């Protein structure tokens, strides 16, 4: 009987450990990942971004405390695992480590879909939710949102102006849609009406949150550009889908794909 008890204890110990461990997220991108991967009872607190529907995806923080990334605010949470971008807050991370806090770095490391999937899988193991994340990864890998357009050169504009596609979410978004960046890259420095017309984009993607103003984005209202895109594919998605390189990019691609079906 005693032996049976010991075996059962050993079997359920890992489950108890996962259930009792809690996590604190201190940045927008870790908020989004934690909300998707962890169970609600595993989340102890999140950043203020977690309550903003313009920045989060479909899972908002409605009942968890929000914390600023400050040492004094985190002192009551030193027994939790802290998800933080070390490059944003190097001094805070150093101070927390001196106090023995458990840090799980969520930096802007992934640059490809496979690297992102590896991070998601790691967080799934960390939280004991491997089955869920494997299902999520399989869903993302199987998503087919290619637009099958013959002309694919794409201009992406956001509320903050021209999108420079060196951050991984934009090349990934284009790849998911079967689109390509402009052959003549436009940057914030060389962006102008003349340069846009010369680049002859075949597709326009607008990314906005309807809260910002930018002179470059305002160029879209120019009659010449209005005429250029009058009979060309023109899509719009909220900015929340590209704030972070995470599963939101796939959601954004799916939203554009659905728009293409009714154009």
What are these regions, as identified by a protein language model?
Residues 21-37, 129-178:
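Basic- and aromatic-lined ligand-binding clefts that recognize polyanionic substrates
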Residues 22-87:
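A short, structured surface patch at a secondary-structure boundary
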Residues 49-52, 60-61, 163-189:
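Alpha-helical, coiled-coil/dimerization segments enriched in small aliphatic residues
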Residues 26, 114-125, 134, 147, ...:
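Structured C-terminal subdomain patch of bacterial secreted/periplasmic proteins
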Residues 10-19:
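Hydrophobic h-region of N-terminal signal peptides that target proteins for export
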Residues 70-79, 98-99, 192-200:
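Short helices/loops that flank or line small-molecule/ion binding pockets
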Residues 84-86, 105-112, 155-165, 238:
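Short beta-strand->loop
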Residues 2-10:
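Sec-dependent signal peptide recognition
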């Amino acid at each position: 009987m005693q032996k049976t008890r010991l075996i059962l204890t050993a079997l359920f110990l890992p489950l108890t450990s996962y259930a009792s461990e809690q996590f604190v997220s201190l940045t927008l991108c870790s908020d989004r990942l934690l909300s998707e991967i962890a169970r609600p009872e595993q989340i102890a607190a999140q950043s203020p971004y977690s309550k903003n529907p313009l920045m989060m995806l479909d899972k908002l923080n409605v009942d968890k405390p929000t914390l600023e990334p400050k040492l004094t605010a985190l002192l009551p949470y030193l027994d939790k695992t802290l998800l933080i971008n070390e490059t944003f807050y190097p001094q805070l991370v150093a101070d927390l480590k001196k106090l023995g806090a458990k840090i799980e770095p969520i930096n802007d490391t992934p640059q490809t879909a496979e690297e992102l999937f590896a991070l998601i899988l790691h967080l799934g193991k960390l939280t004991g939710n491997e089955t869920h994340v494997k299902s999520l990864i399989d869903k993302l890998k199987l998503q087919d949102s290619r637009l099958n357009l013959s002309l694919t050169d794409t201009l992406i504009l956001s509320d903050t102006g021209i999108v420079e596609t060196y951050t991984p979410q934009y090349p990934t978004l284009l790849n998911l849609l079967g689109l390509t960046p402009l052959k003549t890259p436009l940057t914030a420095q060389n962006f102008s009406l003349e340069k846009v017309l010369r680049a002859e984009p075949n597709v326009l993607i607008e990314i906005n949150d309807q809260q910002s103003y930018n002179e470059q984005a305002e160029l879209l209202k120019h009659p010449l550009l209005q005429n250029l895109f009058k009979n060309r594919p023109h899509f719009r998605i909220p900015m929340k889908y590209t704030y972070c390189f995470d599963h939101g990019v796939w959601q954004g691609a799916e939203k554009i794909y659905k728009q293409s079906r009714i154009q």
